[in-house]
Regions:
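Bacterial N-terminal signal peptides
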Residues: 4-16
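Intrinsic disorder/low-complexity segments
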Residues: 15-21, 390, 399
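General marker for long, soluble alpha-helical cores
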Residues: 19-101
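Helix N-cap / beta->alpha transition motif
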Residues: 29, 277-279
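Structured extracytoplasmic
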Residues: 92-273, 280-286, 292-305, 309-322, ...
């Protein structure tokens, strides 16, 4: 069956222009970025934004450092460019200065830490009280260069780098192990593009840990976190053990009999890998990443999500809750604007990026507190309950 991809609700502005060769991106470290931005507050906003759009980070920048750098920028354009720069590097390793040289734990110590993670996830999902929070999402998309059929002929539309396509602020409720979004606000509120993610409050944690226990978990490194030393495990999950569906809307399936395409959603369970960053004493997960194992030639060539967690004070008590997430999806365009569909056409890769911040937490219902758990006496870590709520990974779907 021949497939043709249709990107629905693609947002962006196109300006006819002659094709131009893009200048190579300058690769910089976090330390070099800090040096470049040391005097940014004295320069025009647009100038700093232009400078940031021409560089690429070679390592991840911490949220604390990102917040500090944003505060020193002259305006919203530069701040947006910095967020795009930082989020694009969210799945990279940390700067060398944040990697600690402490010896790796022995097998017994590593197993005890893994047991602590499992206990923490089980207690978090089962005993997290009913909460409400505001999820602020900024959606970014780029626009690949393409030839467009206009009224007077074919014109080349210049490529556009990642840019904001919308923002939304919706109330999210975590209740009875289920994450519920205010659908009315989603329907009538501002749109942020087509990338949708949910499940940060617990389902992602339980599903990744359960899958990782069926896959491969290895020691990563010690890192310097906000509160001191944190530990990192690497994990890899094969497709036969995976519960990670990559979803994309929409694909044209051409009917060989009448030539009329049937629109369907592309969905595939994929193998994936990532990192679990945690407090070695309590097992509390502070950061988790998921990256699908996809090849550059596939319909969807990249999909991933990173979620950060931190202590939030709610009604006088502290709970570990989501504070930030970054999700990304890359897919090939297959529908040329203003032109007839080509059954074998495969265009450039288009990127969708969501930056999400959680805040304004409030609590209702039970007085139950989160328990962090410890290693216990169990010799075999037990995975999270299969009753845990499912999550929705990064997906490009039609927004109504």
């Amino acid at each position: 069956m021949r497939n043709l991809l249709l990107l629905t609700l693609t947002i962006g502005f196109a300006f006819p222009a002659f094709a131009a060769k893009e200048a190579p991106m300058a690769k910089v470290t976090v330390a070099q970025l800090e040096q470049e931005l040391a005097t940014a507050h004295d320069r025009p906003d647009a100038e700093v934004a232009q400078q940031l759009s021409g560089i690429e980070l070679t390592e991840r920048i911490s949220t604390a450092k990102l917040t500090r750098l944003k505060a020193n920028l002259p305006g919203s354009k530069a701040q947006e460019a910095l967020v795009i720069l930082a989020d694009s590097a969210a799945f990279l390793g940390p700067p060398a200065g944040e990697i600690l040289a402490n010896a790796a734990p022995d097998a017994a110590a590593a197993r005890q830490m893994l047991t602590g993670i499992v206990n923490y996830v089980n207690s978090t999902v089962r005993q997290l009280p009913d909460l409400m929070a505001v999820r602020d999402t900024t959606g970014f998309e780029d626009k690949p260069q393409e030839d467009v059929q206009g009224e007077t002929g074919i014109a080349t539309v210049a490529a556009m780098p990642l840019h904001s396509v919308g923002r939304s602020s919706v109330m999210v409720t975590y209740r009875d192990r289920q994450e519920v979004v205010d659908e009315n606000a989603l329907k009538h509120g501002p749109k942020v593009g087509g990338l949708e993610v949910k499940g940060e409050f617990g389902p992602i944690l339980s599903r990744v840990v359960a899958d990782a226990l069926q896959g491969k978990i290895t020691w990563g490194r010690w890192e310097l976190g906000v509160g001191g030393k944190v530990a990192v495990f690497h994990y890899a999950v094969p497709s036969e053990k995976s519960h990670y569906p990559v979803q994309f809307c929409c694909v044209f399936d051409w009917n060989a009999f009448n030539g009329i395409p049937d629109i369907r959603v592309f969905r595939e369970i994929v193998s994936y890998h990532g990192e679990i960053v945690f407090d070695p004493a309590s097992g509390a997960i502070l950061r988790i990443t998921m990256e699908a194992d996809l090849s550059a030639g596939e319909l969807v060539s990249r999909a991933g999500i990173q979620v950060e967690y931190g202590p939030m004070e709610i009604a006088g008590k502290k709970y570990i809750c989501p504070t930030k997430s970054v999700s990304i999806l890359q897919a090939h365009t297959a529908q040329q604007s203003g032109m007839y569909s080509k059954q074998h056409y495969k265009g450039s890769t288009k990127t969708y990026l969501n930056d999400v911040a959680f805040g304004q937490y409030r609590r209702f219902g039970s007085e139950t507190r989160i328990l962090t758990g410890d290693g216990g006496d169990s010799s075999q870590p037990r995975g999270p309950s299969s009753a845990d709520a499912p999550y929705s990974p990064p997906s490009r779907t039609a927004t109504h």
